[in-house]
């Protein structure tokens, strides 16, 4: 079955976005993620009509999927080991929240790799990033908080488990970079502390280069690609 792809409104990336490269966590501190995760929290003005439609689409997807899951649970209750309590259906947090300041933040993510079911080989996923003209970028810059973005995404409902309640994952499919805000590295904070005859960095970060054109229109579209990433 084809997967429906949605396009977000223009929004502002929050800090700690992982778009150019995935986040692998910190294994030494006990929260490593060997599969890697691309992710971005995108804040959109509530006055943008698309913002409310995004909320409505997510809520509808969740309500329909949750109702079906509860019906299935009641019709076929899972077997429970003696002395154990059954895990009853419950709902989790939605992947968005109203900030109370006229904006809503949506949380998008996807895995950066998957295991081939036949070969058991790990396949890496390169997140597609396009420029404001819809051209795929070969060298994706580090995209910092404050960057203006649009994203393409799919809705992936998931059931409750012992860790989280039933909700919807906003599966990140691709990103349009409209306005870039990079990490300044705190250079302005050092303006008054210049040391003469010291080390001077040579060159600057590479500009992003367009590679090939990809359709990135405003309308929702259908994608036939299989969802290899799975749920969180």
UniProtKB/Swiss-Prot annotation:
Q: What does this protein do?
A: Single-stranded DNA-binding protein that participates in viral DNA replication, formation of concatemers, recombination and repair of double-stranded breaks. Coats the lagging-strand ssDNA as the replication fork advances and stimulates the activities of viral DNA polymerase and primase/helicase. Coordinates simultaneous synthesis of leading- and lagging-strands. Together with DNA primase/helicase, promotes pairing of two homologous DNA molecules containing complementary single-stranded regions and mediates homologous DNA strand exchange. Also promotes the formation of joint molecules.
Protein origin, superkingdom: Viruses
Acidic residues biased stretches = 214-232
Organism per entry: Escherichia phage T7
Q: Which family does it belong to?
A: Belongs to the Teseptimavirus single-stranded DNA-binding protein family.
Task: Write out the entry's keywords from A to Z.
Answer: DNA damage, DNA repair, DNA replication, DNA-binding, Viral DNA replication
Q: Which residues cross the membrane?
A: none
What does the entry give for GO biological process?
DNA recombination; DNA repair; DNA replication; viral DNA genome replication
Subunit annotation: Homodimer. Interacts (via C-terminus) with the viral DNA polymerase. Interacts with the viral helicase/primase. Part of the replicase complex that includes the DNA polymerase, host thioredoxin, the primase/helicase and the single-stranded DNA binding protein.
HAMAP family recorded for this chain?
SSB_T7
Alphabetical list of InterPro entries matching this protein: NA-bd_OB-fold (IPR012340), SBB_BPT7 (IPR049476), SSB_T7 (IPR016411)
Protein name stated in the entry:
Single-stranded DNA-binding protein
- Region (Dimerization and interaction with the viral DNA polymerase and helicase) residue ranges read 212-232
Q: What is known of its domains?
A: The acidic C-terminus is involved in modulating the ssDNA binding properties. It is also required for dimer formation and for interactions with the viral DNA polymerase and the helicase.
Any single GO molecular-function term of the entry would be:
single-stranded DNA binding
Region (Disordered) location: 189-232
């Amino acid at each position: 079955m084809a997967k429906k792809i949605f396009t977000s409104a223009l929004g502002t990336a929050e800090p700690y976005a992982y778009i150019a490269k995935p986040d692998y966590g910190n294994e030494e501190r006990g929260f490593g993620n060997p599969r890697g995760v691309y992710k971005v929290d995108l804040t959109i003005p509530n006055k943008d009509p698309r913002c409310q439609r995004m909320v409505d689409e997510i809520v509808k997807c969740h309500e329909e999927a949750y109702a079906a899951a509860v019906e299935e649970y009641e019709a076929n209750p899972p077997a429970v080991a003696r002395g154990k309590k059954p895990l009853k259906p419950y709902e989790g947090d939605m992947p968005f929240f109203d900030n109370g300041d006229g904006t809503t933040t949506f949380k998008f993510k996807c895995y950066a790799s998957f295991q081939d079911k036949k070969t058991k080989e790990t396949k890496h996923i390169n997140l597609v990033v396009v420029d404001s003209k819809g051209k795929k970028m070969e060298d994706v810059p580090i995209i910092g908080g404050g960057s203006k973005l649009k994203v393409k995404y799919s809705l992936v409902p998931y059931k409750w488990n012992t860790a989280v309640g039933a909700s919807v994952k906003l599966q990140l499919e691709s990103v349009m970079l409209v306005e870039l805000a990079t990490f300044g590295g705190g250079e302005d904070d050092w303006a008054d502390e210049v040391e003469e005859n010291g080390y001077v960095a040579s060159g600057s970060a590479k500009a992003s280069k367009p590679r090939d054109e990809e359709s990135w229109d405003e309308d929702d579209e259908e994608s036939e690609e299989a969802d290899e990433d799975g749920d969180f």
